[in-house]
Design a protein with these regions (language model features):
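Conserved catalytic motifs of ABC-family nucleotide-binding domains
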Residues: 53
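ABC transporter nucleotide-binding domain
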Residues: 75-166
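Helix N-cap at the start of a conserved alpha-helix in ABC-type nucleotide-binding domains
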Residues: 68-70
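Catalytic Walker B motif of ABC-type/P-loop ATPase nucleotide-binding domains
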Residues: 57-60
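Conserved ABC ATPase "signature" region
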Residues: 1-28
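Hydrophobic anchor residue at the start of the ABC signature
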Residues: 46
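Conserved ABC ATPase signature
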Residues: 32-36
Length: 207
């Protein structure tokens, strides 16, 4: 309530109730914060920051110290705030969290290295690589694939061929045709997805 008055919130009781309920703290509203766990204090800080309905919000490690259930609640809450059209700056070392929540990700190492969507960062750092799951893969297939003009890289891992293409959407059918004509049983095709952590490590490595 003190912070609500500092922010000159008109409906103090209504706003306090709204955000305490949304963050699962309403039943503890009469308790002193000294009895709160670290996670509860974290949620209380978020509720306090939202009392005056800011359109721009800075959150520093909002799920730090929270158990999995509370972390999920906070992430869902942040997603709801985003759907309401609020701009949120999220500072986090949890790259999986950043990948789930953020439209754009900035990577810093003494300076801003890059700022883009997670998907664009993956593409710019690693390109788009397609995984062809085969009944049986052989090293000789790689040599043949590398002769194709639209194949940038190719390697075999067990019974999988991992291929980097100029344009997967266009080239995938051509690869399938090539493999089928060679008598290869193609069982499944999927795109290799790198984690945001792998992207981050590669970016800071070459910075």
């Amino acid at each position: 309530r003190i912070f609500a008055e500092l922010y000159e919130v008109k409906d103090v009781s209504g706003q306090v109730e709204k955000y305490l309920k949304m963050l699962g703290l309403w039943d503890r509203r009469s308790d002193t914060t000294s009895t709160f766990s670290k996670g509860m204090k974290q949620k209380l800080a978020i509720a306090r920051a939202l009392l005056h309905e800011p359109r721009l919000l800075f959150l520093d490690e909002p799920t730090s110290g929270l158990d999995p259930e509370a972390s999920h609640l906070v992430r869902e809450f942040i997603s709801e705030l985003k759907r309401e059209g609020r701009t949120i700056f999220l500072c986090t070392h949890n790259l999986d969290e950043a990948d789930r929540l953020c439209d754009r990700v900035g990577v810093f190492k003494t300076r801003l290295l890059v700022l883009d969507s997670p998907a664009a960062l993956r593409k710019s750092v690693f390109g788009r690589k397609v995984v062809f799951h085969l009944a049986e893969a052989k090293d000789c297939m790689v040599d043949g694939l590398l002769q194709l003009p639209f194949v940038q890289e190719a390697k075999r891992v067990d019974n999988k061929l991992i291929i980097q293409l100029d344009d997967p959407d266009k080239n995938n059918p051509e690869i399938v045709r090539y493999l089928v004509d060679a008598g290869v049983d193609v069982q499944f095709i999927g795109e290799l997805r790198y984690s945001l952590e792998e992207v981050y490590l590669q970016l800071v490595k070459v910075a």
